[in-house]
């Protein structure tokens, strides 16, 4: 199944401002993970100026919907976001595909 990377660019004072929105953001992330949509997610560090979230699905709709619902986006902590298709060439997913084609 295809992967999609959701890239976030954050405001300079993101860490200082995220507190009141963090619980809701994490709730949305955990729900997406429980549905099998969100595979990995986390903030970028040094500097903490963005985040990367990896989704899996037939199309980018789940990643796009997550961004539109995310309180970080809705409250201006994320200045820009974009979703890109991600081709995995090394990892568990590639082993599974190799086994299926054998």
What is each model feature region?
Residues 1-102:
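Conserved, structured core segments of small domains
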């Amino acid at each position: 199944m295809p992967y999609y990377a959701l890239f976030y660019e954050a405001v300079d004072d993101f860490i200082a401002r995220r507190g009141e929105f963090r619980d809701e953001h994490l709730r949305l992330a955990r729900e997406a993970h429980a549905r099998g949509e969100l595979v990995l997610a986390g903030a970028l560090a040094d500097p903490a100026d963005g985040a990367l979230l990896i989704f899996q699905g037939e199309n980018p709709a789940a990643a796009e919907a997550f961004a539109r619902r995310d309180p970080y986006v809705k409250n201006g902590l994320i200045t820009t976001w974009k979703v890109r298709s991600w081709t995995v060439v090394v990892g568990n997913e590639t082993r599974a595909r190799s086994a299926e084609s054998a």
